[in-house]
């Protein structure tokens, strides 16, 4: 059984027991989160596709970790002008483990 959920502007294919890195959620480590925006639920040959969401479906997951990705460095320069700038960015993420898919 698997489902496609929508969170943080992205879509993820998840199954029970899967660990997924999603955009930062406002939840403490060890707490449970519920994803109500379920686009598709498949259980063998039984496939439910939402229009746009599946009614009554939800995915329950446990927050494993809050963290930041590796740093992405951006460097801009203008030749012959002695002008340059260097920026760094670390995107925050939340690692969740899917516990239950209800449809």
Swiss-Prot record:
GO terms for biological process: translation. This is Large ribosomal subunit protein bL21. InterPro entries: bL21-like, bL21-like_sf, Ribosomal_bL21, Ribosomal_bL21_CS. Belongs to the bacterial ribosomal protein bL21 family. It comes from Lactobacillus acidophilus (strain ATCC 700396 / NCK56 / N2 / NCFM). PANTHER family: 50S RIBOSOMAL PROTEIN L21, LARGE RIBOSOMAL SUBUNIT PROTEIN BL21M. Keywords: Ribonucleoprotein, Ribosomal protein, RNA-binding, rRNA-binding. Part of the 50S ribosomal subunit. Contacts protein L20. It holds the Pfam family Ribosomal_L21p. Signal peptide: none annotated. GO terms for cellular component: cytoplasm; ribonucleoprotein complex; ribosome. One of its GO terms (molecular function) is structural constituent of ribosome. This protein binds to 23S rRNA in the presence of protein L20. PROSITE patterns: RIBOSOMAL_L21.
């Amino acid at each position: 059984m698997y489902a496609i959920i929508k969170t943080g502007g992205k879509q993820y294919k998840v199954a029970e027991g899967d660990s997924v890195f999603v955009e930062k959620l406002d939840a403490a480590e060890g707490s449970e989160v519920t994803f109500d925006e379920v686009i598709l639920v498949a259980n063998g040959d039984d496939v439910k596709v939402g229009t746009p969401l599946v009614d009554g479906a939800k995915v329950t997951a446990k927050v494993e970790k809050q963290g930041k990705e590796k740093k992405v460095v951006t460097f801009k320069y203008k030749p012959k002008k002695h002008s340059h700038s260097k920026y760094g960015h670390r995107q925050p993420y939340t690692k969740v483990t899917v516990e239950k898919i209800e449809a």
